[in-house]
Regions:
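Domain-length accessory/inserted modules outside core catalytic folds
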Residues: 2-77, 81-156
Length: 156
């Protein structure tokens, strides 16, 4: 989430948002993983800019417990919002569209409002998760498109 938020908020220059990514990675500093992270950064930015909208958040797959996937999605949204805020300059945030501001508010609410303990393993809970995941995916694509005018806008 931190890498995608940084890309959506300001681009591939990670100087401002790398500390958020380091925090998300835990104990290992970026330097130890820089080649892999640079490759992942390039692939992620290509997916965000792809006119076929191939971007997918990196989250646990369907074989994992739903509660674990819900927690991972909440953590992804939290890291996204933190990195976006770190990457976007204050003046640029003031010029943000109302829709972009609402999307960031929604992602913040998802980060703080998803309760994995309230999720069972039934089809309704799985469907709810998939709908939230798709919203997050489209929100990231829209936020990227707003900050990168050459990218296609998804909008809704």
């Amino acid at each position: 989430g931190a890498m995608v938020g940084g890309l959506c908020g300001g681009g591939a220059d990670g100087g401002v948002w790398e500390p958020v990514l380091e925090a998300a990675l835990g104990d290992a500093p970026i330097g130890a993983r820089e080649p892999e992270l640079r490759q992942m950064l390039s692939l992620t930015e290509a997916a965000l800019a792809d006119p076929e909208y191939t971007f997918e958040p990196m989250l646990p797959d369907a074989g994992e417990l739903l509660a674990d996937r819900v927690q991972a999605l909440a953590d992804w949204c939290d890291a996204f919002v933190l990195a976006y805020a770190a990457a976007a300059r204050d003046a640029e945030r003031e010029q943000m569209s109302d829709e972009a501001g609402e999307l960031l508010e929604d992602l913040t609410a998802i980060a703080g409002g998803l309760d994995p303990s309230g999720m069972g393993e039934d089809e309704d809970d799985e469907e709810d998760y998939m709908q939230i995941l798709e919203f997050v995916r489209i929100a990231a694509l829209n936020l990227y498109a707003e900050r990168h005018p050459g990218a296609d806008a998804v909008l809704h």
